[in-house]
């Protein structure tokens, strides 16, 4: 109840209270039925039964259940708010409803009863208080606390149901083998009250009601009279024998001809002789002068208008005795005038709209001007992207969480199966984030190269080394000799060891900083990195080598300075081989540096 603001009390009954409330976030006015906290199991049974039926059956002439929750051990049912009933109409029109209004109301009430009976449901409490009337004139049947399915042959029902004034004779005599005709009897009593403004069988006890039934409707059948004679409640009571008119119009003179025929078909003492709701809808009272053909479009327009205004949220089930929502969707039975069920307008329709809007946004994001351009990714990343795309096309992804995160960076495949984007800085990240292509030190990189083909980079590095070596040879060409070959080899080995040691320090330092989990280390996929940084480092090391050679040239004779241009080709190939090994070590260290 924290989400709702109480505005007042609407009604109160033997099983609970109905409050008028306002949703604090949306401002929607709702009616909340609060069941009393009683030790009897009957209260929970009635609440559970009403929840079950309202979840399972939806119709435009049945009240809509919005939400169910339990607070302080009390069950709360949230309904659409309609504060007007047929009883309020009768209090306003003391002499009964006008004929046009009465026919429209009865047509909708019969449609609701027919829908329930076609699904083998008995309401068992039809009365003016349980017929809601909206501002546009749409009637909705409510209060399903006594509703239940038809029993199998041999099963029995509860004997004390329905309000006394509208109770059929088999219910008064506590016959447990009743069925749909009890609703038809209650409808007949209510029709007379709606037409005249006065209840037809007001009574203070079951005996009083039974006496009035015999006087106004007819004598008991042999089966019912046998139950009456054996009942200890009516022991010693003798019912009168009354002669009644045979025609309906003489029996109910206050009603017009066709309406009297409907009431006479409903109020039959024998349940087997009572008419059905389907036959009543086909009666001349509704089919004459094209009433149905004219009223159906009007009713459809009113339903569409109310559906736009009252787009209710689908109930969030917090009641432990409720069935799962997935099972509910399979068992919902509808019978509507619309192309869809107006009772289901709400979260399901909003979810479909969000799905369509999401598709439009995805199309716009792919074809817009501000998109990130597509780049060539390694093959293993392409596989992950295709798999993620296939997963996103499943309907369950839209039902659970729309993958809006894909629009921000469509090139980033670091998303789990639920469409939730993972933190790229977390230790469990599966793939490194993309490289910023605008960095100044990456302008010379080849973005289309692959990690599986490092030969091109080694070739470029070898060319750079040769170019720098030739520069050294041109500078010192007048003072080189072949005698000091071992000295030059030792110098190069020292420089190589120095570079390797520096790279090892850099890689070990990066290992300590990153501190990735061991279990995830083998599953990292590293993106393509250029070779520019290492090329610059090697260039700096060669400059240092030049300075060392210059200092040695000043101390030694010119005859002892080696010449790089006149080196042996075999020795150059050997150095190239060492360079390849060196390049592999640098490549391995570069991976740790990139991490």
UniProtKB/Swiss-Prot annotation:
Protein name, as recorded: Cyclin-dependent kinase-like 3
Domain Protein kinase: 4-286
UniProt xrefs under PANTHER family: CELL DIVISION PROTEIN KINASE, CYCLIN-DEPENDENT KINASE-LIKE 3
Residues that bear Phosphothreonine: 158
The UniProt record lists the keyword Transport: no
Bias-annotated ranges (Polar residues): 387-397, 468-491, 499-509
Catalytic activity: L-seryl-[protein] + ATP = O-phospho-L-seryl-[protein] + ADP + H(+); L-threonyl-[protein] + ATP = O-phospho-L-threonyl-[protein] + ADP + H(+)
EC number: 2.7.11.22
Pfam family, one: Pkinase
Phosphotyrosine carried by residues: 160
Biased composition (Basic and acidic residues): 368-386, 570-585
Gene3D superfamilies linked: Phosphorylase Kinase, domain 1, Transferase(Phosphotransferase) domain 1
Keyword field: ATP-binding, Cytoplasm, Kinase, Nucleotide-binding, Phosphoprotein, Serine/threonine-protein kinase, Transferase
UniProt motif ([NKR]KIAxRE) ranges: 45-51
Family affiliation: Belongs to the protein kinase superfamily. CMGC Ser/Thr protein kinase family. CDC2/CDKX subfamily.
Ranges annotated as biased composition (Low complexity): 448-457
Gene behind the chain: Cdkl3
